[in-house]
Swiss-Prot record:
Residues 24-35 have a biased composition (Basic residues). Disulfide bonds: none annotated. It is found in: Nucleus. The keyword Cell membrane does not apply. It holds the Pfam family DUF4211. InterPro entries: DUF4211. Residues 54-81 have a biased composition (Polar residues). This is Uncharacterized protein C17H9.06c. The keyword Cell inner membrane does not apply.
Length: 601
């Protein structure tokens, strides 16, 4: 059997239909909460004891959502979110003042009486993501314009006060604090409205059910204009605090709407037009140095000669004619100073020119030197070693001239190396270094036999002939190579300093050598480089024998100079110089291709 209390609850559910809405600029849509009606009807049919447990569990869930919202800014998946929703019904009967006074919240009491709340039905307010079970609420009209009271079925009111500024909802003697409401998501907070002072706009239709028949009907709900609230909203329960806050906000809005004049800073320009009249009246403070300079300028201007009265410019430069004379005097002063500077610079340039002329004359006088002084200087230079003289910085062609003088002197009167000038010996060492270093690194092979290398360096004559191809090369001892040339070393070894044949030498054990094509070309280039000096000295000796046959007898230095001039006229030095350059190129570059091209010519 269903009790009378359950029947009363069912009638109240039909009497106060559930509609929820959120004002414009929110994410919640007006809908009927049919699921909440079904859950409430099922919970009422079970009995008072089960209804108590469900109510207590819903209240506990309600508090846990508040505590979890305060502990973390981001809601987790397990927590429910509190969504404040307004339920409106214009047909709600106005209760008596005695009942309303009994249902008010006592601020001093901190305990909550749950025994009086057992018989209340439950509804569920659904958000887009989560649901929260709260007691059944119904909205009642109120006399005040800025306050709306919300009453429940029995003695458990929930009040939504001062929608414009602060929101406080009470359930029984328990109240929702400021921290819990502030920590709700910004999209779920209800912004307040100033329902009295603002102009009302047209409302929109909300579907609801008739209180008696249960037939759906349409109602026009007026929506007031929204006011933008400040970010820092204070929530309180007292009426006095709300009035003071609203009054202070109105005053602040009025003052904020007043247009303030823009502050204009005075410009700090040097022109008279931009400066303010107060700045013009202020005295100009100058230092003592500036005052002295101004006084000197004024005195110089006064001492100047008067300007011709007949002189007039076609176009007046200044509006004030009195300033014209002053500036003309200044211009003449500047011209005088410039003329003085020009005279000083011209005098300095003249002195510099005279000094340079004197220096040139002294250099010309020093250039003329006596013969005695030259002999002393030559003797001093000869005492210097060649490495510290100018010969060490000369080019290859200068070393070649000294080297040719040395060969001519050795051909006429061979002397020991100790009696030869260091300059000639230094030039010969530089030429030999460039030739032999390239030959040892690029031409002579490391796999050649030592006896074959010794014959190339000591024996001046080498003859060759072609043979049939046979296996094996005598120079490199590679049996797979085909030998196509046979080489004969003939002649007597000679002294490297005076180019004379030696009396005692080791006999040649092997005269004929069978060589391959690559070894033959390398040996031919190396032999021509090592014995290039000997060939030049032999040519000069032939020239001396020709002169002796013609009975041209000269003595000492005159013979060396005359032979040198004759060789120079016969272009012998030029041909030997070209040959030396070609040998250096063959030794340093790819010798095979260059040698073949040279041999074909």
């Amino acid at each position: 059997m269903v009790s009378n209390q359950d029947n009363v609850q069912r009638n109240d559910v039909q009497k106060y239909p559930i509609t929820r809405f959120v004002k414009r600029k929110s994410n919640v849509v007006l809908k009927k909460n049919k699921g909440a009606m079904k859950s409430n009807s099922n919970s009422r049919s079970r009995g008072n004891k089960k209804l108590k447990e469900s109510q207590f569990s819903s209240r506990d869930n309600f508090r846990t959502t508040q505590t979890q919202a305060s502990s973390s800014s981001e809601p987790s998946d397990n927590t429910n979110r509190l969504v404040p929703v307004v339920i409106i019904d214009n047909n709600t009967p106005k209760k008596e003042e005695s009942n309303a006074e009994k249902l008010k919240l006592d601020k001093d009491s901190s305990s909550v009486n749950y025994e009086n709340q057992i018989s209340k039905p439950l509804i569920t307010f659904s958000d887009i993501h989560e649901t929260v079970n709260v007691p059944f609420l119904c909205l009642d009209k109120h006399d005040s314009k800025n306050e709306v009271a919300i009453n429940s079925h029995e003695d458990s009111p929930v009040c939504l006060e001062d929608i414009t500024g602060s929101l406080s909802s009470t359930y029984g003697n328990d109240s929702l604090g400021e921290s819990n409401l502030e920590e709700l998501p910004t999209s779920d907070k209800i912004k307040g409205e100033n329902m009295g002072s603002r102009k009302k706009r047209k409302g929109f239709v909300i579907d609801s059910e008739d209180s008696d028949t249960g037939i759906p009907r349409e109602e026009n709900v007026t929506i007031t204009r929204k006011t933008k609230l400040s970010s820092n909203i204070l929530y309180s329960d007292s009426d006095t605090e709300r009035q003071s806050d609203s009054g202070s906000k109105n005053v602040a809005r009025q003052f904020s709407r007043i247009k303030r004049k823009r502050k204009v800073l005075s410009s700090s320009s040097e022109d008279d037009e931009s400066s303010s009249p107060e700045d013009l009246l202020k005295p100009i403070i100058r230092s003592t140095e500036e005052m002295e300079n101004l006084n000197e300028l004024e005195q110089e201007v006064q001492d100047l000669d008067p300007i011709d009265e007949g002189f007039e410019e076609k176009v007046p430069r200044f509006r004030n004619p009195s300033k014209k004379a002053f500036y003309e005097k200044l211009h003449s002063l500047r011209n005088r100073s410039y003329s003085k500077l020009e005279s000083l610079t011209s005098e300095k340039s003249d002195t510099l020119i005279t000094k340079s002329e004197l220096a040139n004359e002294s250099e010309e006088d020093d250039f003329i030197v006596d013969d005695e002084d030259t002999e002393v200087m030559m003797n001093a230079r000869s005492l210097l070693p060649a490495e510290f003289s100018m010969t060490s910085h000369q080019g290859l062609k200068a070393h070649f001239r000294n080297f040719m003088m040395f060969i001519v002197q050795q051909a006429i009167d061979p002397i020991d190396a100790s009696d030869i000038s260091d300059h000639y010996l230094f030039s010969r060492r530089t030429i030999r270094k460039q030739l032999y270093s390239s030959v040892d690194s690029n031409i002579i092979s490391s796999i050649w036999q030592s006896e074959f290398i010794k014959l190339i360096k000591t024996v001046p004559n080498m003859k060759s002939a072609k043979i049939d191809a046979t296996y094996g090369c005598d120079a490199c001892n590679i049996h797979t190579r085909m030998s196509t040339q046979i080489v004969y070393f003939k002649g007597m070894p000679y002294n490297e300093h005076n180019y004379k044949e030696l009396d005692s030498f080791e006999p040649i054990t092997k005269e004929a050598w069978m060589l391959g094509n690559s070894c033959f070309n390398r040996a031919r280039i190396a032999h021509s480089i090592y014995h290039w000096e000997y060939k030049v000295s032999r040519h000069i000796q032939v020239e001396l024998k020709f002169r002796e046959a013609s009975n041209t007898s000269e003595q000492g230095k005159n013979i060396v100079e005359s032979i040198y001039e004759d060789l120079k006229d016969s272009n012998f030095f030029e041909t030997t110089w070209v040959e030396l350059c070609n040998l250096l190129k063959l030794a340093s570059s790819s010798f095979e291709s260059n040698f073949h091209s040279r041999s074909s010519m």
